[in-house]
């Protein structure tokens, strides 16, 4: 079997690229607003740090490669990479983590391969996975949504936490993660996985404050719905195609429904999978990256379905509570194979 892969770059029209990237940035506003509302100012500060780091790192590498800095920065791809990484990490993560992750994403995962259009893996997810593997404690230290938080830091305390690790009164992350029940909180997916391992039943877990009166976790369901709104905007503007997000979400829902049907005492419900974690962010903003996703319609359906299966498997049986980043990167590996078998036949040419 011989793979015939068109030569890179795969993104040719800079004006079209800039327009798409700008639309994605605009579409991210509802998700950013929701995360800021439920988890505080840290989301915005992380975005600013990531954006500055992405632009500086991109400019330095472009200068070293003797390429035009201004024209490349105007495609907004560096900003988008920084944004996607920033909204994926905890809002109060130390400043150096977002700088390190964004720098790695731009320099190693993007520019080392030749820049936009030539990277085989999603740069933001490469940066995220590097941080998650290297600093698992910090990367899983999410604040509880303000509705169930015992203490909510203001803007200045948020800055102090990001740059020094303490609030003005001496509080630290351990204190800020305590909920109204006096117990340290985690994300709905993390809570579900760790509680099951501790021997708690699903019925007991669903009584925790993080799930109180919510389909998929207080705050998180609204965050996911906000990213869904942005995704619908992208579909309306034809900035992305429907194949990947639809196949991803349907496959994830199907796997979750079957698992829940046969083992409701140990596996999460479909609504928890669909409306918690990075599900909608991944479906519409990460998996749809035109550079690292499949390029044919049939291939996009397969690519999205594969990612959906992987997310469910990692969440249900893996060591990490979410799994979207790992699923994206594993699916990226299969793109050349998927495209090889799904590329339409060109009539008038015989197979070599």
Curated annotation (Swiss-Prot):
The enzyme's E.C. designation: 7.-.-.-
Ranges annotated as spanning the membrane: 20-40, 42-62, 69-91, 123-143, 215-235, 242-262, 267-287, 301-321, 322-342
Residues modified as FMN phosphoryl threonine: 187
Major enzyme class: translocase
Pfam families hit by this protein: NQR2_RnfD_RnfE (PF03116)
Record protein name field: Ion-translocating oxidoreductase complex subunit D
Family the entry assigns: Belongs to the NqrB/RnfD family.
Keyword Cytoplasm: no
GO biological process: electron transport chain; transmembrane transport
Cofactor(s) essential for the protein: FMN
Cellular compartments annotated: Cell inner membrane
Function: Part of a membrane-bound complex that couples electron transfer with translocation of ions across the membrane. Required to maintain the reduced state of SoxR.
UniProt keyword terms in alphabetical order: Cell inner membrane, Cell membrane, Electron transport, Flavoprotein, FMN, Membrane, Phosphoprotein, Translocase, Transmembrane, Transmembrane helix, Transport
Organism lineage: Bacteria, Pseudomonadati, Pseudomonadota, Gammaproteobacteria, Enterobacterales
Gene Ontology CC annotation, any one: plasma membrane
Subunit-level organization: The complex is composed of six subunits: RsxA, RsxB, RsxC, RsxD, RsxE and RsxG.
Annotated membrane topology: Multi-pass membrane protein
Record carries keyword Metal-binding: no
Superkingdom per UniProt: Bacteria
């Amino acid at each position: 079997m011989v793979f015939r892969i068109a030569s890179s770059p795969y993104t040719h029209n800079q004006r079209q690229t800039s327009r798409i990237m700008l639309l994605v940035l605009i579409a991210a506003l509802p998700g950013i607003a929701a995360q800021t509302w439920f988890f505080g100012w840290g989301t915005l500060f992380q975005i600013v740090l990531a954006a500055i780091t992405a632009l500086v790192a991109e400019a330095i590498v472009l200068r070293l490669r003797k390429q035009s800095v201004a024209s490349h920065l105007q495609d907004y791809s560096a900003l988008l990479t920084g944004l996607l990484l920033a909204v994926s990490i905890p809002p109060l993560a130390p400043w150096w983590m977002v700088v390190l992750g964004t720098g790695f994403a731009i320099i190693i995962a993007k520019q080392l391969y030749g820049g936009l259009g030539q990277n085989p893996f999603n740069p933001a997810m490469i940066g995220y996975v590097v941080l998650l593997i290297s600093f698992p404690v910090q990367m899983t230290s999410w604040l509880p949504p303000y509705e169930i938080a015992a203490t909510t830091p203001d803007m200045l305390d948020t800055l102090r936490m990001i740059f020094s690790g303490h609030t003005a009164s001496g509080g630290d992350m351990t204190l800020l993660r305590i909920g109204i029940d006096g117990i340290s909180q985690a994300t709905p997916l993390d809570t579900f996985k760790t509680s099951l391992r501790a021997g708690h039943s699903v019925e007991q877990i669903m009584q925790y404050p993080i799930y109180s009166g919510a389909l998929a976790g207080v705050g998180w369901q609204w965050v996911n719905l906000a990213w869904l709104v942005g995704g619908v905007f992208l579909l309306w503007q034809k900035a992305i195609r429907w194949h990947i997000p639809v196949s991803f979400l349907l496959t994830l829902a199907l796997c979750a429904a079957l698992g829940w049907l046969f083992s409701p005492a140990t596996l999460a419900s479909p609504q928890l999978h669909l409306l918690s974690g990075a599900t909608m962010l991944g479906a519409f903003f990460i998996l749809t990256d035109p550079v690292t996703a499949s390029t044919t319609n049939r291939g996009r359906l397969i690519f999205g379905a594969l990612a959906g299966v992987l997310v469910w498997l990692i969440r249900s049986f893996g060591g990490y509570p979410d799994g979207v980043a790992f699923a994206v990167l594993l699916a990226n590996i299969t793109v050349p194979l998927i495209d090889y078998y799904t590329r339409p036949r060109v009539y008038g040419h015989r197979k070599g």
